[in-house]
Design a protein with these regions (language model features):
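Helix-start (N-cap) detector for alpha-helical repeat units in TPR-like alpha-solenoids
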Residues: 381, 415-416, 431, 449-450, ...
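A conserved beta-strand-loop-helix scaffold within acyl/acetyltransferase catalytic domains
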Residues: 22-105, 148-315
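Active-site/acyl-donor-binding loops of N-acyltransferases
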Residues: 2-21, 91, 159-197, 338-386, ...
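Register position in tetratricopeptide repeats
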Residues: 393, 427-428, 461-462, 495
Length: 539
């Protein structure tokens, strides 16, 4: 595997018998955007493909997410120009709840996608999926979250066969809500016929009559109306939807709600701009009663109900039933063949003539809880540094030190990690170890005065006055107006019993500068103090 290959692609070849597939790693948006035509071809051919694996949806999502992501892309053979046959989009993060730090892999669509999975052209599952699994096992991670996985049993078994329980800790996460008992592993969906009346005929008599009565009542009324979001109204309509949603869910979800609203607003806004959102709002006069956001998969001819919000104080005909019926009829009239209610077996969904599909959340972990290979993934170094720094700030020094050292195992020249580790060691009184870090830092950032100042202070704490003086001299040379450098240099010269030389040099500099000041008003330049008495620190 060649890290940093052209177009941010790592390349590996995975052989199965006489066959081989070529696995590339895509890590940048330009490289990902270059896959659009190939991605759509695989997507259209894959019967398991769904909107949250579509190129349009993922492109919008990946531009927004924080932290590193990557796509494993499999070609049909080890020939560089062979067509792509499979894709696995993922994200990687660093976790600091345990020591040592470790990495986790998540499906790229988490935490906005109701479904995740693998795209694969039929006939290539037995080549591509094992190749992806082998590639994953070569990476550095301690936990692989296969959350909201929607894939055939055959594909799932092909993947899991490479993570045997003898070598990995495998667990299944329950998707049943602890408060409401809703099973989010069950996903109801309605298959849509080409005719609205044919759809209604497939419902129970009570539901059929109810929908017909409600739609007729609303369409004949001047009091009620339904609008559909346009570029001019999308912000208003999203405000309506999310305001109603916030009122309902804040009591249950509490402090999580603001972040969820930001995430949903961002995802739905991007989806609208990409022509992936249908958002009708039900009104009574000028009063909005409810809004319903449905994602549109035009390639697979599917509507996916994502979220709704309604005015809980409205005591009238059920807005949710009306908006679902309206959306289903619109979908049928426009040639869509499926209305997916996504996750959750809420009772009301089953009145719309649905069947069920299921998803799962499988967690694959290492037996010892540590990363495969014993190292952090280099892509997560910035996040690891941020977390280690936060631990440092709140006084969790052993955890922070371990984090800094793990970073340096992967990136030995990381100046920020070296600097902060040195500061931590200084705070704990380990000046010898701190000196070593700061000495390294001066070779990496010789032009930065703080590196020399830290080195000087460590040397001074160790009683290494000559080396401290040399470092302080560099501080004065680089940043003459920093008092710590000038004062430290004077202190060390005093310790070395060379204060007379320092005074003499200082007097020469000040006399020279007094003359300059009289001519043009400039202040004395302390930089000359560092430069003038070079012989003072020569032995």
């Amino acid at each position: 595997m060649a890290r940093g290959a052209e177009n941010s692609k790592d390349i590996a070849t995975s052989k199965i018998g006489a066959k081989a597939v070529r696995v590339e790693v895509i890590e940048t948006m330009p490289s990902f955007e270059g896959l659009e035509q190939d991605w759509n071809a695989v997507y259209d051919a894959d019967p398991d493909a769904q909107l949250f694996l579509s190129f349009k949806w993922l492109a919008g999502w990946l531009k927004w997410v924080s932290g590193p992501w990557f796509v494993l892309a499999a070609r049909a053979s080890d020939v560089a120009e062979a067509p792509y046959v499979a894709f696995l989009p993922m994200r990687i993060s660093v976790k600091t709840s345990d020591i040592p730090f470790h990495n986790e892999l998540n499906m790229a669509g988490n935490f906005a996608a109701d479904y995740t999975g693998i795209l694969c052209r039929p006939g290539f599952e037995h080549q591509a999926i094992p190749a992806f699994a082998r590639h994953l096992k070569q990476m550095n991670w301690a936990r692989l979250n296969l959350e909201n996985i929607r894939m055939s049993e055959t594909r799932y078994r092909l993947l899991m066969a490479h993570f045997p329980k003898a070598n990995f800790a495998i667990s299944q996460v329950s998707l049943v809500g602890k408060v409401d008992g809703i099973d989010n592993a069950l996903c109801p969906f309605a298959t849509l016929p080409p005719d609205w009346n044919a759809y209604l005929d497939g419902l129970s008599a009570n539901t059929r009559q109810k929908i017909r009565r409600l739609l007729k009542q609303f369409e004949a009324s001047d009091e009620y109306r339904i609008t559909v979001a346009t570029p001019e109204t999308i912000d208003r309509d999203l405000d309506t939807l999310l305001r109603f949603w916030e009122i309902k869910w804040t009591p249950r979800k509490g402090n999580l709600v603001p972040a969820m609203i930001r995430s949903n607003r961002g995802m739905l806004t991007r989806s609208f701009k990409s022509d992936l959102l249908y958002l009708p709002t039900l009104w009574r006069g000028d009063r909005p009663l409810a809004a319903l956001a449905t994602l549109i998969d035009r390639r697979k001819r599917s509507f996916l109900f994502y979220m709704t919000g309604r005015d809980e104080t409205f005591d009238g005909p059920p807005p949710g039933v009306i908006l679902h019926a309206h959306s289903i009829r619109y979908a049928i009239e426009n040639g869509f063949t499926e209305y997916d209610f996504l996750r959750g077996n809420e009772t009301y969904k089953y009145s719309f003539g649905v069947k069920e599909r299921s998803i799962r959340h499988t967690v694959i972990g290492t037996k010892n809880g540590r990363n495969i290979g014993g190292r952090l993934d280099s892509r997560t170094v910035p996040a690891a540094l941020k977390e280690a720094t936060e631990l440092h700030k709140v006084g969790k020094l052993p955890q922070a030190e371990r984090g800094y050292r793990q970073i340096l195992e992967v990136d030995p020249q990381n100046a920020d990690a070296i600097h902060r580790l040195g500061q931590l060691l200084t705070a704990t009184g380990n000046h010898a170890a701190a000196r070593k870090q700061f000495k390294t830092l001066t070779t990496i950032r010789p032009e930065v005065f703080k590196a020399w100042l830290c080195l000087a202070q460590s040397c001074e704490a160790l009683g290494q006055h000559l080396e401290a003086a040399r470092a302080y001299r560099q501080v004065v040379k680089l940043q003459p107006n920093v008092p710590d450098g000038f004062n430290g240099l004077g202190r060390m010269l005093h310790k070395l019993n060379r204060i007379e030389e320092f005074d003499a040099a200082m007097e020469l500099v000040l006399e020279d500068e007094r003359q300059v000041t009289e001519r043009n008003g400039r202040a004395p330049d302390r930089r000359k103090v560092a430069a003038a008495p070079a012989s003072v620190l020569s032995h």
